[in-house]
Amino acid sequence: MAFEIEDGVLKKYIQEEGIKDVVIPDGISVIESWAFYRCKGIETLSMPNSVTRIGQSAFKWCSNMKEVKLSESLAHIEACAFVECRNLTSIIIPQSIKEIGFEAFRNCIRLADISVPNDFIGLSSQVFENTRWEKNYPDDFIVINNLLYRYKGNEKSIIIPDSVKIIGQFAFAFSDIESVMVSDYVEEIRGSAFCGCKKLVSVILPDSIKKIEESTFYNCESLEKINLPDSIEEIGFKAFIGCRKLSDIKLPKNLKSLGTKSFKDSAWLKSSNSDFIIIDNVLSAYCGNKKVVNIPEDVTVIGDAAFEDCNGIIEIRMSDKVTRIGNGAFSGCTALEKIEISKNLIILGHAAFRECQALKEISIPESVTEMGNIVFANCKELTSIKLSTNIEQMGEQIFYGHAPELCVFVKKECFAAKYTRRHKVKCKILGSI
C-alpha cells in the first residue's frame, strides 16, 4: 500500500487498483486533511490505536467505504472528515473522543447505526445531516447525552424538554419556530443555536443560563421579546445582531462582558437613552449621533468595534484613564478628523483606525508599548503620525494603503523607527529636525 508518511503524519494515500481493504500502519498519530480524498476503491479501513486526530475532509467522497474501525485513542474528528461516504452503515465512536467537527458525517446516506460514548457532548453542528440515523430518529428533538443536537419538527411554539442541559450549535438554525421556552435544566446555549430563525418572536430564558454565545440569535429579525436573567455574565460576539425589532432589553445585573456587535442593528441600540453602553469600565458600544464625542471618565477600555462605522463623528476626546483601544474600535469612522488619545494608553488594537479617511494627523503617546495589525490601513489623508519610542511590538501592515506623503515622527531611534523604515515609510527623528 502506498502511504506518504512524515513524522507520524499520514499525508496522503495513493490508491492502488484492486486494493479494497486498507490497514493504516501503526505509529501514525494524525491522518492529515484530504489524505484519502476520493479514494473510491476502499471498502474497509482499519486504523491503529496510535491515531489521535483525523483531519478535515480526510475521507471525503470515499463513497464505496462500508466499514471503518476507528482508533481507540482518537480525540478529534475534524469537519467534513467522512462527508459523502455513502455506503458507510455504522460507526462506533471511541471513549477517547473529545470533538466531532462540523458536518463530519454529512450525506453518509446509509449510516443508520451510531454509537457515541455516554458522556460525550463535543458534537458540532450538522454532524449527521442527511444520514439514515437522523432521518429515522423517533423524536423531533434529537438529544444525545443531554445535548440537544437538532430539532427536526414543525411545531411553531417550542418547549425545550427537561432532558436537555445543552442546546447545541445550529440546533434550531433557520427553522420556522415562533416562540421558545427554555427549561430550567438548560445550562448552556451554544453559538448560532437560533441563528436565522426569521419568524422567532419571543424567547424565555431560565436563571440557569450564564452565557449567550456568539451569534446565538443572529438575524432573528422578528424577535421582539427576550428576558435576560441576572445569571448571565457574558453575551458573545454578534449574539443579537440583525434583531431589528428587539427594542426592550434590560441588561443583566451580573453582566461582565458584552461582545462586539452583540446588539448591532437592533431597535434597542438605536433608541438607547444613553450614548454609551459601558460594562465594568469597558465601553462596548456607542449609540449616539454627536459630531464631537467625549468619552466618559469612568472608561478604561474602549472595546472592539465600539465606534465602528460611526461616520458622523468628527472629533473624539478621551480621558487619561483609558489604557486600551480595542480591535477596530474606530474603524470606518470616515469623517473623524481629530482624536485626543489618553496619555496612559498601553495597547492599540488591530485595525483601530482603519479607513479613518479624514484623519490627517495623530499622536500616539509614549505610554504605548503595543500596536496591532493594520492600525492605520487605508487612512488616505493621514500624513503625520507621532509614534511612541517605547513601542516593543508592532503588527503587520500598520500603514497599509497610506498616503505617499505620510511621515512618521519619533523622539529618538527606536523599534518604531526601524519598523517604519523597513516598511518604506518616511521617518524623522524629532530632535534632529
Where in this protein do the model-derived segments appear?
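Structural signature of tandem-repeat unit edges
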Residues: 1-8, 14-30, 40-53, 63-76, ...
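Consensus positions within tandem repeat domains that build extended binding/scaffold surfaces
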Residues: 12, 33-35, 55-58, 78-81, ...
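Short low-complexity, flexible loop/linker segments enriched in glycine and/or proline
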Residues: 129, 423-424
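Short acidic, glycine/serine/threonine-rich loops at helix termini
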Residues: 376, 420
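A structural signal for leucine-rich repeat
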Residues: 399-401, 421-422
